[in-house]
């Protein structure tokens, strides 16, 4: 079991960490900020006169744009 843990940590260290350093733009994306830049608001439910385009932070909230 210890050797499996060792190889898992080694695999993580060799593959995931260098990829995160090499491509930081693919790391974490702040969807709430992106929604605000697009003149949207993060809400639990969009009104009838709004368009839902994406999720904000968690799947329960939506980015709502006015038509």
Curated annotation (Swiss-Prot):
Keyword Acyltransferase: no
Gene Ontology BP annotations: cell chemotaxis; defense response to bacterium; innate immune response
MF-aspect GO terms: CCR6 chemokine receptor binding; chemoattractant activity
Subcellular location: Secreted
Annotated disulfide bonds: 35-63, 42-56, 46-64
Keywords, sorted A to Z: Antibiotic, Antimicrobial, Defensin, Disulfide bond, Secreted, Signal
Main localization, broad class: secreted
An example Gene Ontology CC term for this record: extracellular space
Signal peptide start-end: 1-19
Family: Belongs to the beta-defensin family.
Functional note: Has antibacterial activity.
Protein's UniProt name: Beta-defensin 110
Phylogenetic classification of the source organism: Eukaryota, Metazoa, Chordata, Craniata, Vertebrata
